[in-house]
Amino acid sequence: MAIVSKGILGKKVGMTQVFTEEGHLIPVTVVEAGPCYVIQKKTKATDGYNAIQVGFGALRERLANKPQKGHVAKASVKPMRYIREFRVDDVEAYEIGQVITAELFAAGDAVDVVGISKGKGFAGMIKRHGASRGPMKHGSKYHRRTGSLGAKGPARVFKGRNLPGRMGGERVTVQNLKVVRVDADKNMILVKGAVPGAKKSLLILKPSVKAK
């Protein structure tokens, strides 16, 4: 896992458009980022690596079990719906119970956004892999089917062959997205372009590892 200096959890609100100072209209995704709480600190001495454990999204008391309540009690916070880790260089820069807000990033920063893509269910070759369809007339019985699965010689299908199957619902990372605007009062971060996932789904924002 790559070591990052910071990171924040958020929720996808939706997409809109904003004008830049130059008058250009650009598409942006609105992310409700934070507030997140530092629940646990991990060090090389105790866990073998340096990281902070961050919680986001309040969970109703009756939906949390005793281990969950006990884990967050050390940080004096309520049970969290989402808990994720960020590997950091300096663990001592963070305190248990510390609040991480949208001010962690500023306009102009490059970020990587991680989310779970929308699930499409069982999909065929054309939708899932972008395959070309077959002839649609003159007696053809091959329209949207898979086609050849391989040669007669091996008499088997090799691993990695594009086939119909379940599509979407996977962890996707979109790199080098620009932060257009930050509204700390509303815990909002506007990111240029689209990000993976449905509305209200969990997103992870961290500094871009391939920033230009």
From Swiss-Prot:
Annotated GO biological process: translation
Keywords: Ribonucleoprotein, Ribosomal protein, RNA-binding, rRNA-binding
Bias kind Basic residues: ranges: 128-146
Highest taxon in the source lineage: Bacteria
Gene Ontology, cellular component aspect: cytosolic large ribosomal subunit
Subunit structure: Part of the 50S ribosomal subunit. Forms a cluster with proteins L14 and L19.
Official protein name in the record: Large ribosomal subunit protein uL3
Originating organism: Desulfitobacterium hafniense (strain Y51)
